[in-house]
């Protein structure tokens, strides 16, 4: 393709309709046709990034390979397409305004009055086109967070309007709306969609494709009505019914011709429809799995999206082990020595989840003690790894006051300590150890046999690390340090070889698990949990 084409995905009526899944599905379908694609997310909030946002409000913070803290939708982009994202794939209003203000302070605008139009909108447009220009992508898919009509989205909508005018057929808007079903009347209502499209048209944007989220199947007469009232071609009105799995969405979208509609509207040749072979094989294997394995997630956040990547990674691993993974959430705040046996009863494996702060950590330590002493397969991730280290120090090494400097600055047995380069940092946002770092695995260790190689790269998001001063004591007592960063000499992985599966990673392996390439640690963990269930 001579020129990069741009697809803008917007949403209307209500939030949380699944724009991220639709964007990922479009990317997957175009990728299957041989196009070079990327997906980016523009969030209208004023935070610089989601790194300091409450997981209860916004779900997990996803980390890119180059260390950008981003929205969880970037996790969907990577899991669907297998393409790694970077800082350029995530943008917020905060970053846009900061860039413009920094330029103004530098004198780049030569004394002009800085306004939303053109300066903010120009900066948005520059960032939209940045990836296409730099990497010569065939398609850049840009998801706009929020809902049409939100006051904070206005500059993004104006930027899209301008880009559609400037780029002509090389730009298209895909608008996702909701068609509610009124149970009392027994009717599906299209009026909210009509109003949403009118709102979009009022800012100068005509959607090229409409996707209707619905709980009930939409008959042809409803689709014709929407097409007529919204000035959209009938073959460009697509319905997105609720499905058992988000991974069925690309197949459903292909069946209705979403990719062909986009290509036709943008003047691209249609060609043969891809078979989506490996993707369909994954779905077939997933649907044929009848047996289940029970995995408990021990953490302090009740919102499911707070552990989105872990849940999806377990799901991938279950499929490749021909099992469905039944996930039980166990709130670590309410976990005690008295109730841990009851709370973890019937669980074939336990993940001790990441997090920050004091709240809920003693419950995680209780869980780590129970799973270690009862030989239940256990996977500690980030803070979870730190908790299994603290539990071991308290109950095996005999340091009853062992702790992390994060929780107790005065503990004499600081088995988890703050990294040297973090000691003088006061800002919270974007200052942790972030992104991919190299790790060298100890030959003969369980993790070495799982990865089947010595050198790996995994993504991090933390300030605290295993304290090397205690390494000899830990290893003498049976907890081995089996993964280490060669540059900083930081311990990245610990394991207890004498147990079925007791591994802690300071990094977040869940960020690198995709549909077609599940993460080896999760695959082996679930495999061991299945074996544990059978025994």
Q: Where are the language model's segments positioned?
A:
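Cysteine-nucleophile active-site neighborhood
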Residues: 17-20, 24-28, 32, 343-438, ...
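Short beta-alpha connecting loops at secondary-structure transitions
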Residues: 57-65, 243-247, 352, 373-379, ...
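A generic structural signal for well-ordered coil/turn residues at beta-strand boundaries
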Residues: 3, 206, 233, 291, ...
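Glycine-rich, charge-decorated loop segments at or immediately adjacent to ligand/cofactor-binding or catalytic sites
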Residues: 182-189, 386-395, 496
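Flexible phosphate-sensing "switch/lid" loops adjacent to ATP/NTP-binding sites
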Residues: 1-325, 333-349, 356-357, 363-370, ...
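Active-site proximal loops enriched in glycine and acidic residues that flank catalytic Cys/His/Asp
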Residues: 11, 41, 214, 241, ...
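C-terminal and late-domain segments of enzyme folds
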Residues: 434-438, 442-535
């Amino acid at each position: 393709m001579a020129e990069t084409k741009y697809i803008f995905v917007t949403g209307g009526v209500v939030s949380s309709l699944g724009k991220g899944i639709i964007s990922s599905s479009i990317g997957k379908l175009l990728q299957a046709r041989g196009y070079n694609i990327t997906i980016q997310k523009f969030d209208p909030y004023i935070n610089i990034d989601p790194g300091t946002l409450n997981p209860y409000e916004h779900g997990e913070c996803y980390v890119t390979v180059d260390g950008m803290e981003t929205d969880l939708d970037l996790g969907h982009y990577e899991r669907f397409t297998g393409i790694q994202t970077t800082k350029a794939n995530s943008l917020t209003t905060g970053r846009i305004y900061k860039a413009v203000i920094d330029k103004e302070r530098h004198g780049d605008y030569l004394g002009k009055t800085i306004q939303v139009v053109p300066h903010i909108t120009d900066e948005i447009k520059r960032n939209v086109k940045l990836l296409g220009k730099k990497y010569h992508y065939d398609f850049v898919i840009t998801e706009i967070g929020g809902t049409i009509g939100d006051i904070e989205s206005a500059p993004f909508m104006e930027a899209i309007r301008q880009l559609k005018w400037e780029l002509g057929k090389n730009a298209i808007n895909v608008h996702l709306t909701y068609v509610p079903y009124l149970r009392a009347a027994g009717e599906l209502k299209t009026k909210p969609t009509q109003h949403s499209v009118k709102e979009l048209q009022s800012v100068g944007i005509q959607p090229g494709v409409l996707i209707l989220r619905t709980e009930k199947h939409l008959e042809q007469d409803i689709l014709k009505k929407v097409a007529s009232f919204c000035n959209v071609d009938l073959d460009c009105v697509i319905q997105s019914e609720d499905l058992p799995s988000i991974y069925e969405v690309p197949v459903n979208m292909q069946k209705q011709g979403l990719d062909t509609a986009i290509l036709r509207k943008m003047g691209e040749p249609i060609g043969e429809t891809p078979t989506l072979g490996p993707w369909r094989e994954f779905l077939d294997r997933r649907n044929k799995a009848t047996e289940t394995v029970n995995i408990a997630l021990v953490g302090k956040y009740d919102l499911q999206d707070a552990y989105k990547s872990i849940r999806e990674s377990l799901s991938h691993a279950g499929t490749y082990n021909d099992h469905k993974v039944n996930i039980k959430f166990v709130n670590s705040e309410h976990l005690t020595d008295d109730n841990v046996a009851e709370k973890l009863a019937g669980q074939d494996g336990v993940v001790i989840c990441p997090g920050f702060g004091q709240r809920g950590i003693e419950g995680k330590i209780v869980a780590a003690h129970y799973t270690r002493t009862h030989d239940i397969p256990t996977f500690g991730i980030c803070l979870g790894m730190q908790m299994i280290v603290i539990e071991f120090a308290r109950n095996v090494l005999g340091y009853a006051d062992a702790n992390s400097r994060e929780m107790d600055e005065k503990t004499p047995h600081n088995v988890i300590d703050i990294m040297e380069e973090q000691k003088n940092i006061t800002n919270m946002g974007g200052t942790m150890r972030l992104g991919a770092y190299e790790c060298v695995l100890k030959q003969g260790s369980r993790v070495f046999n799982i990865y089947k190689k010595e050198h790996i790269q995994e993504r991090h998001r933390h300030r605290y690390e295993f304290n090397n001063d205690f390494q000899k004591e830990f290893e003498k007592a049976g907890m081995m340090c089996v993964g280490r960063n060669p540059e900083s000499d930081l311990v990245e992985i610990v394991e207890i070889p004498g147990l079925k599966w007791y591994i802690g990673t300071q990094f977040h392996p869940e960020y690198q698990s995709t549909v077609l390439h599940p993460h080896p640690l999760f695959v082996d963990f679930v495999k061991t949990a299945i074996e544990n269930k059978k025994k």
